[in-house]
Each structure stands twice: as C-alpha cells, then as structure tokens.
Design a protein with these regions (language model features):
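Residues within the DNA-recognition helix of helix-turn-helix
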Residues: 4, 142-145
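Helix-turn-helix DNA-binding module
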Residues: 105, 109, 113, 121-138
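C-terminal edge and immediately downstream basic/flexible tail or linker adjoining helix-turn-helix-like DNA-binding
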Residues: 130-131, 147-162
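Amphipathic, Lys/Arg- and hydrophobic-enriched alpha-helical face
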Residues: 1-19, 36, 104
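Sigma70-family region 2
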Residues: 30-45, 64-65
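Structural recognition of an alpha-helix C-terminal capping motif at a helix-to-coil junction
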Residues: 10, 24-31, 44-56
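Arg/Lys-rich amphipathic alpha helix in sigma70-family domain 2
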Residues: 38, 52-71
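Internal acidic/polar
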Residues: 68-92
C-alpha cells in the first residue's frame, strides 16, 4: 500500500486535479482489492492492474462530477539529493532543478504523462501502452518527443545513444 500510494495519488491527481479526491480514489481501489483479495492470484501484473483501476475510478469520478477528462501532470515531486557542499553550488543546483521542473511542466500533456510513467514510476513501455490504451510505438514516440523537448529546454543537445 505505502509503496504505491504516493505514485498512484500523483497519477490520480493528474486526472482529477484534486489531491484529496485522488487520495480517496486510491484508498477506494486498495479497499476494493483487499475485499476481493481471494482473486489476487488471478492477476498477472498487480501494479499495472492497480494503476488501471485507479485510472478507471478517476475517470468515473470525473464523469460523476460532469467535468471534462484531461490527463495532466501538474504535481511532480522531483527529489534531488544535494551533491554540493557550498551554498553557491546548492543555489545553482536548485535553479537547475527548477528549470527542469518548468521544462517538464511545459511538455504536451500526453508526452508529459508518458515521461512521468516511464521515468518517475519506472513503468515499461508495454505497461504504459496498456494503461493509456495506446500502442507501444506511440509510447516510444511520445517519450522521444518529451526527451527532445527537455534536452532543448535545459540546453543540452539531444543525442541518441550509440
């Protein structure tokens, strides 16, 4: 529960735009899974199953509230250990982190979501494709778009790995 709660809450918040509602949705999903735990051995990939359940419940909640469904990642918690000892380097590190967060937030919504799921939540392309009902190729393309835009935004030329 605690391992996935933070990631699932951020994911649901991106859909419903309310942290409290997102926490309620995630809690409801976990309660539902607990109540139906005898079927857990039938689920092949539990983490993916939970993400899909959260997505479906969040969309259902929006429909109940007659709101337009948009997927957005506005609350990305980026944690960075301070690698620098002197205050000047710490300020520069903080400014760099802010620049990266701004660049991530300026990505197109789908590219931002794919980037978050792949890089922050460490999901595989196939899991992302299943979760978002898109092809693996679309996941690859969206991640490529995100990485190119981020590289341009932070001033690093984009180079493919050899």
């Amino acid at each position: 529960f605690m391992i996935l709660f933070h990631s699932l809450t951020r994911f649901a918040t991106g859909i419903v735009h309310s942290k409290e509602t997102a926490e309620e949705i995630v809690s409801d999903v976990f309660i539902s899974i607990w109540n139906d735990r005898v079927r857990l051995n039938e689920i092949e990939d539990l983490q993916l199953y939970i993400f899909i359940a959260v997505k479906n419940n969040a969309i259902r909640k929006l429909k109940q509230q007659n709101k337009r469904v948009t997927i957005s990642i506005d609350e990305i918690d980026v944690e960075m250990d301070s690698l620098y000892q002197n205050p000047e380097d710490q300020i520069m590190s903080s400014e760099s982190l802010h620049h990266i967060e701004t660049a991530i937030n300026s990505l197109p919504p789908r590219a931002r979501l794919v980037f978050k799921l792949a890089k922050e939540d460490k999901m595989r392309y196939k899991e992302i494709a299943t979760l978002l009902n898109i092809s693996v190729k679309t996941v690859d393309n969206q991640l490529s778009i995100a990485l190119k835009k981020l590289a341009q935004a932070v001033g690093t030329p984009f180079r493919k790995k050899s």
